[in-house]
Amino acid sequence: LGRSSSNLTIFTGLLAAISAAMLPGTAAAQGLLPEGIVAWQVGYRSYKSQENAFDSNFQLRPIGADYTMRFDNEMLLSGRGGKDLQRLATVLQTVGDPSETALDLGVLQQHVSADISASVFGFAYGASKDMTVFVGAPWTTALVKNRIVFSGINNAKSILERLGNIAFDELRQGLEQASLLDVATIRNSIESEGYGPIDRWQYSGIGDLQVGLKTAFNIELMDGMPIAFEYSPSLSLPTGHADDPDLINDIGLGKGYVSVGQSLSQRIQLTPYFSAGLDQMYAYNMDARVKRRVPEDSESIVAADRKTNVLHNPGDDYELGAALEFGTGMFKGNLRFADHRHFGDRYTGSIVGNYSKISANSDTELITQEIGFSMNTVEAFQRKEFVIPYIAKLTASFPVAGLNSPNFEYYEFSLTSFLDPR
């Protein structure tokens, strides 16, 4: 049985990076706060239940598909079914006709689903007329369900009957045990290695803390067509839940390392009712010491005594987006396409092992399209035409294509309002 979290760790960096965009001051083209003004923001994002993910061929597959395992002779000889079954399959090759003693014990399938949501709380402050500072963090919740099914015809008993007296005691005992292989046996072998809940994992807690600042300036290319630039450096601190090597189905809802990001956006006002622009973000992810179970070879269940501190060298992140914005007065809409990319991770440690298996499929990409509508009463409030200044926004985001990435579809509502401490 493969760890479902190995597949689900594709959520880790991407979820943390996308959630950061909900925070005040980090969303593209929101403008600076006047000096001394405080903005607060609350938001809620609900993700569509995750049952499929994009694989290395940009195809959607069930999350558990990578862990469909056929316990046939080839798989058992490779050692992926455990050392005992590997030894049994090897011995059987030397007894009788190999074509008649090839083990086929059945097929294991996993059906995995993950339900994720995030509530965001943040504050921003106009430190000067040219700079806004912000801080915020999501409160994340996750529920992962994993149903294990073991099916097929187990031929261990028939091989034992065919061998008859040729089978020595140890071989006979091994075949008898192999004939009893079922879900309960597999579950016991996993739990004996110290792994946590197999069928269900639930979490609720703070995500990664985001702090940063933003500045902005305008350049006028020609009369009546200015370009607005916004630049924002930020720091992401690993306060969220990171992948736990002892939990079989957990999701990394935080990065697990410090991330230093920079974002730049440009908007050009084409008409009084229409603007367009680009967004760029690049984050340098710093090395971190983490605990992992290091496989000796290609085994799926890694022994508890293989857990050790390793150096995690995460790949960096970038995002490139293009946006169209339209509307007038209090009501506006936007259409945005974005490419979210996380470069592959590396792990190194003091014990000998297959570190490349830990970082497999960590190079991810997700292309998304989103549509949003907002209501902004700030100018109406300044004209004393509205009682409360606020910005309410509703956003829907849909995946277009992906590489080793979640099939993220989400719906988000955010509300921003303002305080004047003066």
Residue ranges, per PLM feature:
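Loop-centered beta-sheet repeat module
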Residues: 227-286
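Residues on the lipid-exposed face of transmembrane beta-strands in outer-membrane beta-barrel proteins
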Residues: 121-127, 135, 211-217, 233, ...
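Short loop/turn motifs that connect adjacent beta-strands in outer-membrane beta-barrel proteins
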Residues: 27-38, 125-126, 130, 144-146, ...
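Short sequence motifs at beta-strands and strand-loop junctions characteristic
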Residues: 107-117, 198-207, 243, 254-258, ...
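Outer membrane beta-barrel transmembrane domains
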Residues: 55-77, 157-173, 183-189, 288-422
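Transmembrane beta-barrel domains of Gram-negative outer membranes and organellar outer membranes
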Residues: 29-229, 319, 350-356
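Transmembrane beta-strands of outer-membrane beta-barrel pores
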Residues: 44-50, 137-143, 208, 217, ...
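Transmembrane beta-strands of outer-membrane beta-barrel proteins
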Residues: 38-42, 133-135, 211, 227-233, ...
